Amino acid sequence: MKESILDVLLYLFEHYFSEDADLVRDRDSLQNGLIQAGFSPAEISKAFDWLDALSEQRPSVARPHVDGPVRIYHGQELDKLDVDCRGFLLFLEQHRILDADQRELVLDRAMALDQDELDLDDLKWVVLMVLFNQPGAEAAYAWMETQMFLDEPEPVH
């Protein structure tokens, strides 16, 4: 089975984290569950490293949303994120779902995935995982979670 870090992360998110946010995150039991699900130890280790990096980059204090300059993307980011992905990030920032720090965290975590390109659905999962890990982002997380399962985007209020 050809799996990626994102496949492991999605499996963890769908089967463990989204069901019980207070789940004791015993790495050994999670790893055993992932191995039983058919993931390789190497990909599991990379996924745990990805999650560790996400938790280490948590902003210490929520900052108010301010309109700042437009983000200019590096060539590697342009290669990995198509125009739909970049437009979606801009949409999220303009509608105050993400602030600039969270956008940068999403970009960092997207670039850390072992995929040459991410499509919009993959990026949405990265955004959802970042928001899930952000204190004070419960409303943004709930909105984003709703968007994952709708064909048409719900308006932001």
Swiss-Prot record:
At the top level of its lineage, which domain of life is listed? Bacteria
Q: Source species, please? A: Xanthomonas oryzae pv. oryzae (strain KACC10331 / KXO85)
| Protein name (database record) | Protein Smg homolog
Leader peptide range in chain numbering:
none
Recorded family membership: Belongs to the Smg family.
Which Pfam family, just one, is annotated for this protein? DUF494
- Please give the InterPro entries that the UniProt record associates with this protein: Smg (IPR007456)
